[in-house]
Structures are given as structure tokens and as C-alpha cells.
Amino acid sequence: MDHQDKAATVAMASRPQATQLQEPVTFRDVAVDFTQEEWGQLDPTQRTLYRDVMLETFGHLLSVGPDLPKPAVISQLEQGAELWVADRGGTGACHPGWILEPEDHTLLKDQGLPKMEPSPITEKDGFAKAVPCRSMIGIDQESDGQRQALKKDQSNLNDPKEIPLQSQSHKSLGLVEACVLGLNTYLLPDISGREYGCTYDSQVKNSEHNPSLVRQRTDSPATQSFDDNGSQKAFDQIMPITELTKSQVQDKPYKCTDCGKSFNHNAHLTVHKRIHTGERPYMCKECGKAFSQNSSLVQHERIHTGDKPYKCDECGKSFCHSTHLTVHRRIHTGEKPYECQDCGRAFNQNSSLGRHKRTHTGEKPYTCSVCGKSFSRTTCLFLHLRTHTEERPYECNHCGKGFRHSSSLAQHQRKHAGEKPYECRQRLIFEQAPALIKYEWTEPLGCDSPLSQGERTQRSDRPFKCNQCGKCFTQSSHLIRHQLTHSREEEPLRGRSRRQEQPCRRGSRLIQNTNSNSRELPVAQPKAGQASRTLALFDLREIMQEQNPVHVIGVEEPSVGNSMLFDTRESR
């Protein structure tokens, strides 16, 4: 009988067993037990690895069956307590995938197999930590030839070899012949990229096995190889689990019925569905804020505890979230990966780019529910809502006065501190910027001392100059308002025609009609409740329209570099 016939015989013999393995998997089937002596031989790193794997295994079982009760060992591991499992009859199991019954021990004793001895976790060839274990073989008691082959193979058990985790079990044999701290790859197709290996050494002929000895899913016989004697070849190399489970990772059988997104695990799908349902089962005990994931709650609790584990190496600033540190580092590196396609401006955050795009589109998605006014940012909407609610959250510590904005509070506190940060060209100091602007509108720019080079540069930025006092302005409209102050100071001249032209820089000028019948404009009197300094272009238009000889055709708002022209015509 050649190798292909033998492989076919093995496949046919294992088919009934494959049907039998469709039983519900319990935590006992995948748990790993250590005696007190064995637990004491593990170092802290190995115990931490054991804890992580056991908790992750139980989590995957919960994703399959949510009603699975929580074992006591899981509760102890979650609390971080030290534990050890009592010896179960003197035979320690190095793999949780199978449990030996009393009749199994008798069978092993009759077959002359050595007892299972756990070995410490080791590293080999740079791969992840693996758990060596002795292979347990199911024997056909009716075959004497296979008994002799078994005795021959027992001599090889003293020198175990490393095999890939994919060959966990073999249907042609009777028992699982690999172990990874209780890790079953058919239950855990993805374990966060960690790689495990296990020891294996067995060269035994095909035999029918005792079904009571196996409680583990088996691999396909097509993936197994046989030597000339029909026995399975020993594997002498370790392969990463990431390679072996690549097809399993790409397979996403769990699909969301709402949006069609697929996932590898049912637990991931359960968390994703909370986005559609709005369910937030994890609530903060401090502030009552709820979250859909436990990890989000843990990150939020750092706000209350003040824990900031992520520290910047450049400036030493700490953050409670790793994403905040990543964004902060772009300040030092100058990285701006988010670029606007309309103007080419770059930003270091995607949210900043989103806000910037609204300046091009004019979108204002945030609308006030009271008055209907829209805003492009949520912060602007929140500040606007305070005008309706009369909320003043910023209160002065000295006088108790409240303000809607923090900037208004800071401006108010300068009165108590006597701080005057605004300084004019004549070295006069003001508490607030509006007071400085008012002074510049009414007072000339002249200085007793010679101007410095910096002041000359600043003056050159004010091209509009008043001919009466020499004061300069940045905008022509400011010059017009300033000239009204001079007109109120002078006594109006009536019955006298004159031609007046006030040249300004950059071609700005005021042209009045030179007709002999034209008369001087009267003094503009401010209206009730209106400050004299607030007279603007529309006030000037009203004054000119009241006079019969002069009719205003139009007043154009000036801009820097353009002429300002008042077209006047004599009324007939």
C-alpha cells in the first residue's frame, strides 16, 4: 500500500470523529491547570503570559456563548491575585484541549506511555515563547506491530523538536500532539499578532484511537506527510502563527446588517452594533458619562485621576491619550500631513482641516435652535447660546461680576490690577484697545521727540493724513470720521462760497462743487443717544441731502489705493 492509499485510509477513519467533535466547547475544555509546585517554577513573565492568554481565551468563549458562567479562576486572574490549581490525581495537563478520564490513565499505563511532565516556557530562534510538552498517543490495542512501533518512538521523546502551531492535532493519531498554554487556534484565529510555538515528536503508524482521549478539533489529513513506513514525519521547525492564520484573519464571517461592515470575531461585531443602537453600557462613576467600549472608559477615567502616562521627550509635556501625544509631536517636527486641496494650506490635525474647508464652502452646520442663526463651529454656537440663556460662567474674584467670555474677564481684571497693556505713539497707556482707538481718532499723531526708525515704518502704514492736524490713518473712512470732529469745532460759515480740496496720499481726495451758488455744509449735530464720534458715511449723506443746492448722487465706500469721490451736482 503506497502513501496515497494510507492517507486515504486515515481520512476515512477520521470522518466519524470529525462529526463527533461538533460539541459545545466549555471553558474546562480549553483551560490550563498548574499544580502548586508547577506554579512556583514559573517566573513573573510566564505568569503574566498565562494570565493574558487565559483572559483572552475566556473573552473569545463569551463572544461565542454570552451566557457562559465566569469560572473562579477567571475572577482571580481579573483581580490580579496569585493562584495555583490543586494537583488532579498526579498527572498535570500541559494543554487544556483534552482532559484525561480515570480509564485514560489506565490505558496509558498499560501502553507504557510516560506521564505528562510540564516544561518551562522557553525561547528558540527568536520566535515567541513556546510550551514544550510530551505527545500522548492513542493506540490500537489490537495491533502488535503498532505496539512495537510505539516502543521505538518512545526513545525519541527525550529530544523533542519544535513544530508549527498549525499541526496541533492529527486525526490519524488519537490525541492532540501540540500545546500552547491552553491556546486553541480554531477558537482564537487572531491573538493580536502574538506568535506561539509548541513541541512535538511522534513517529507512530496510523491507528484507530480511543474517542474518549480526544476533545480537540483536528487538522485535515491532506496537510500531513508520511514516511516509507506509513508513520507521520516529525516537524523540526517553528513557523509564526501570523503566517498560519492569514487566511483566517482575511475571513470575516460576521457582517453588520445595518451598514454591511464585516469583522473577524463576533465580539467585534457586538461592539460595532452599539454605534447604530447608541448603547453605552460603560458609565463613569465620577461624572456619569457613558461609553460603548471599556477601553474608552479607562481613558476617560484618567481625566479624573490626573494620570498622564504619555510624555513628550522634547518638552516633557504629558498627555492622558497616546493620540494626543502623536498630534503634539507634530508641533516639534513641523509635520502637517493634512492639506487643503483648494488653497494648499496644511494642518497637523484632520479636524482643523475640516473646519478650514468650511471657509471655502461657506457651510454653517451648527444652527441655534432659538433664533435660527447658523455657525461654522460648535464653539461659536456655544458662545452665542449664552446670549439667550444669560449664562455668565466667568466670574471676577474681586468684585463678583460675571462675563460670557474669558477674554472679557481678562480685560476686566486689568482694572483691578492696574495693568495697561495698550500704548499709543505718544506713550500714553490705555487699559482697553477701544480706548486707544478712540484717542487716535480724536488726537493728532504729532510727537515732541523725533520719530524713531520703527515709528517711521509704522507711520508709513497710515497713508491717509489729515491736513488740519497732521494725524494719519490706515483707512480713509477713519479719516472722514476724524474730519467731522474738526467741522464741529469750527463755527459754520454761511453765505460764503469757497473751493476746498483736501489731498490725501494714494490719490484719495474730496472734490466739492465749485459752483458759486454752493454753500458751506452745516454743522452735523449728533442724534439723541448717539455719540459724536460714531458719525459715519450715512450721517454725512443725510446732512448733504437736507441742503437744496447740493444733491448727492452716490457715496462709494473707499478702499486703500482707490480714490474716494463724492459726486455732487447743483440742483436746478
UniProtKB/Swiss-Prot annotation:
Residues 150-162, 486-504 have a biased composition (Basic and acidic residues). GO terms for molecular function: zinc ion binding. There is a cross-link at K171, K246, K438 (Glycyl lysine isopeptide (Lys-Gly) (interchain with G-Cter in SUMO2)). Residues 140-164, 205-231, 483-529 are annotated as: Disordered. GO terms for biological process: BMP signaling pathway; negative regulation of transcription by RNA polymerase II. It comes from the Eukaryota. A zinc finger (C2H2-type) spans 254-276, 282-304, 310-332, 338-360, 366-388, 394-416, 464-486. It holds the Pfam family zf-C2H2. Interacts with SMAD1 (via MH1 and MH2 domains). Interacts with SMAD5. Interacts weakly with SMAD2, SMAD3 and SMAD4. Belongs to the krueppel C2H2-type zinc-finger protein family. This is Zinc finger protein 8. It comes from Mus musculus. The lineage of its organism: Eukaryota, Metazoa, Chordata, Craniata, Vertebrata. The gene is Znf8.
